[in-house]
Amino acid sequence: MKSPKKSIHTFQVIIEQDEAGWYVAECPALKACYTQGKTYEEAIANIKDVIAMCLEELKANGQPVPEQPEIISVRRVEVTV
């Protein structure tokens, strides 16, 4: 019996470092798809695993993989209040 064909997906992720020094990774294209790691590399490995789990759940529920929105720019802006 053949195993199901796997497909490759590419997603943009956001990595931030919190106050405690942990790296927090989020995939904006997939709701509730986030994780953390003690190192940057661990956060990247963890977000790949979480994205795979999210995609498997979508597939199991017969839902399509969401379109990856094109991010035009990520910037820091200064605001005075």
Task: State what each model feature region is.
Residues 3-24, 28:
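N-terminal first-folded block
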Residues 23-57:
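Amphipathic, hydrophobic secondary-structure cores in small proteins
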Residues 1-12, 45-81:
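Short, charged, surface-exposed hinge/linker loops at domain edges
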